[in-house]
Swiss-Prot record:
This is Isopenicillin N synthase. One of its GO terms (cellular component) is cytosol. InterPro entries: DIOX_N, IPNS-like_FE2OG_OXY, IPNS-like_sf, Isopenicillin-N_synth_CS, Oxoglu/Fe-dep_dioxygenase_dom. Belongs to the iron/ascorbate-dependent oxidoreductase family. Fe(2+) binds at H214, D216, H270.
């Protein structure tokens, strides 16, 4: 059987985005622009985050947490006693049906006294954590990682803004530590033996899948993953394989970026192939604040006019997450 063609996913040195040299930053911006209008994906290298420590700490957590602890942390979709946990918490595997499992946490600044927590604003939750004695240092590491990847994402948003001909802070002014709705998801795909048939989905083209086609619900997505190729992106000629790189972050636009740019930077349709190997997928979904709204425009037009209507990020996120679950099922 012939192998699937590889997608063009360039490696972009994003380190200039942390500096002051505008000429170098514009080189990065042009590379981001080209990638965003091709396959929609690029690898960010020289990003400044210790991804090996991230991988090791996540593996240690996944292999030490017990079933009882997972249940105690489970989101409402799995544990009905946890009515306030819609996003943050543990997403369980289901024997004979779903092998993947994950732990999701939100902005560490969402404490009980946060105004948006106090007002019970949708999509805002206080994080839940495993017992510190059983998982010493995990919470401290996870919260620090949130801010590390937040900093990288802020730099990437500066690059996207420049790529679109805007001021550097065009996106980052809406991406604030006090109220960003971004999430870290620590996903584990286990090796299975035996393999329950229900764990494998089959696409219309016959490809075996772990997760069906979708667009990301985000402004952009910043993903670290194991060195196990599993993602495919849809292109006019069909689905193409995305090569893995466990030293870099895979970056792509979400559907909010597609909406506000009139699809100038589309959200690439992608899917997860079935690969029976132990691996990690650790996305950071870059989300703005609940009340933030970016006015849509069309970068391809001189006057920028578009018929796209503005939508607040909170409304977008709520509707997008529900639609994704309705389409592909609870993750």
């Amino acid at each position: 059987m012939a192998s699937t063609p590889k997608a063009n996913v360039p490696k972009i040195d994003v380190s200039p985005l942390f500096g002051d040299n505008m000429e170098e930053k514009m080189k990065v911006a042009r590379a981001i622009d080209a990638a965003s209008r091709d396959t929609g994906f690029f690898y960010a290298v020289n990003h400044g985050v210790d991804v090996k420590r991230l991988s090791n700490k996540t593996r240690e957590f996944h292999f030490s947490i017990t079933d009882e602890e997972k249940w105690d942390l489970a989101i409402r979709a799995y544990n009905k006693e946890h009515q306030d946990q819609i996003r943050a918490g543990y997403y369980l595997s289901i024997p004979e049906k779903k092998a993947v499992e994950s732990f999701c946490y939100l902005n560490p600044n969402f404490k009980p006294d946060h105004p948006l927590i106090q007002s019970k604003t949708p999509t805002h939750e206080v994080n839940v954590w495993p017992d510190e004695k059983k998982h010493p240092g995990f919470r401290e590491f996870a919260e620090q990682y949130y801010w590390d990847v937040f900093g990288l994402s802020s730099a990437l948003l500066r690059g996207y803004a420049l790529a679109l001909g805007k001021e550097e802070d065009f996106f980052s002014r809406h991406f604030k530590k006090e109220d960003a709705l971004s999430s870290v998801v620590l996903i584990r795909y286990p090796y299975l033996n035996p393999i329950p048939p229900a764990a494998i989905k089959t696409a219309e083209d016959g490809t075996k899948l772990s997760f069906e086609w979708h667009e990301d619900v985000s402004l952009i997505t910043v993903l670290y993953q194991s060195d196990v190729a599993n993602l495919q992106v849809e292109m006019p000629q069909g689905y193409l394989d995305i090569e893995a790189d466990d030293n870099a972050y895979l970056v792509n636009c979400g559907s909010y970026m597609a909406h506000i740019t009139n699809n100038y930077y589309p959200a690439p349709i992608h899917r997860v192939k079935w690969v029976n190997e132990e691996r990690q997928s650790l996305p950071f979904f870059v989300n703005l604040g609940f009340n933030d709204t970016v006015q849509p425009w069309d970068p391809s037009k001189e006057d920028g006019k578009t018929d796209q209507r503005p939508i607040s990020y909170g409304d977008y996120l709520q509707n997008g997450l529900v639609s994704l679950i309705n389409k592909n099922g609870q993750t």
